[in-house]
Amino acid sequence: SDVWHTAEAVAPKAGVLQAKVHLSGKAKHVVCLTTAGAKKSLHILPAGKQVKDAIYTLVWNEKEAVNYVNDVEVARSKNPLAGEALHLLLRSYLPENVKGTGKMEIDWIRIYTNA
């Protein structure tokens, strides 16, 4: 398991997070915005929607979060982090009882805000 987490908050109450990502292997991959301590999160790579080579986008505001894969909406939900300071978290891990390896290669990550 590998984890990378920003120490300082990177995102305010609303914005856009985009990442151009290449995924491979059996590992599960996470790119998300989290609260301090990672108690709650908004995932840019929605569960079950991971595509090997894609541009993932998360658009969030006080009310909702919308996920896109290659500009196609794949998920929409209430924003559980409304009003929270958010940190960027990257993680790859092998689920329990899964053998093998995996790789997450990131070409770029962009965060746009109205700050």
Where are these regions (language model features)?
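GH16 jelly-roll
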Residues: 1-115
